[in-house]
Amino acid sequence: MKTSIQQLVAVLLNRQVANWVVLYVKLHNFHWNVNGPNFFTLHEKFEELYTEASGHIDTLAERVLSIGGSPIATLAASLEEASIKEATGGESAAEMVSSVVNDFVDLVGELKVARDVADEADDEATADMLDAIEAGLEKHVWMLEAFLE
């Protein structure tokens, strides 16, 4: 029987599954709809990021399963659970990049909370996985902010 702290780990991981599903679609939206002088750079970057998002979805969902949970697996459930919001459409290239930066910063904060809960549950594998995702996001934030300067 799982303790309440172990159940909370699964809930927090599922939030991240949902966030990455929404972000995956958002990044595709930006990839398809970016325009302007930075088209080639951003078109490629958004593809890199949605490919990475796909890997995070799978890794997070499989971790939920491995700790006895059930991963969110529908778009409707993802939209309901996610803290990340869909793109509204019509964003400029700079607004797209700013939106991704803001989403990544928010995710870093949520990942830190989830990692602390995983640490409390003595779930080192989950904590390590979350640390790795966080480190990647922090690097992306740095690079994308440099692009916006």
UniProtKB/Swiss-Prot annotation:
Alphabetized Gene3D superfamilies for the sequence: 1.20.1260.10
Gene Ontology CC: one annotated term: cytoplasm
Domain of life: Bacteria
Coarse class of the protein's main subcellular location: cytoplasm
Subcellular location: Cytoplasm, Nucleoid
InterPro entries: DPS_DNA-bd, DPS_DNA-bd_CS, Ferritin-like, Ferritin-like_SF, Ferritin_DPS_dom
GO molecular function annotations of the record: DNA binding; ferric iron binding; oxidoreductase activity, acting on metal ions
Keywords from the UniProt entry: Cytoplasm, DNA condensation, DNA-binding, Iron, Iron storage, Metal-binding, Oxidoreductase
Catalytic reactions of this protein: 2 Fe(2+) + H2O2 + 2 H(+) = 2 Fe(3+) + 2 H2O
Binding site for Fe cation 2: E62
Keyword Amino-acid biosynthesis: no
GO terms for biological process, alphabetical: chromosome condensation; intracellular iron ion homeostasis
EC numbers, comma separated: 1.16.-.-
Subunit-level organization: The 12 subunits form a hollow sphere into which the mineral iron core of up to 500 Fe(3+) can be deposited. Homododecamer.
Domain description: 12 di-nuclear ferroxidase centers are located at the interfaces between subunits related by 2-fold symmetry axes.
Role according to the record: During stationary phase, binds the chromosome non-specifically, forming a highly ordered and stable dps-DNA co-crystal within which chromosomal DNA is condensed and protected from diverse damages. It protects DNA from oxidative damage by sequestering intracellular Fe(2+) ion and storing it in the form of Fe(3+) oxyhydroxide mineral. One hydrogen peroxide oxidizes two Fe(2+) ions, which prevents hydroxyl radical production by the Fenton reaction.
UniProt name for this protein: DNA protection during starvation protein
Organism: Brevibacillus brevis
Gene symbol of the encoding locus: dps
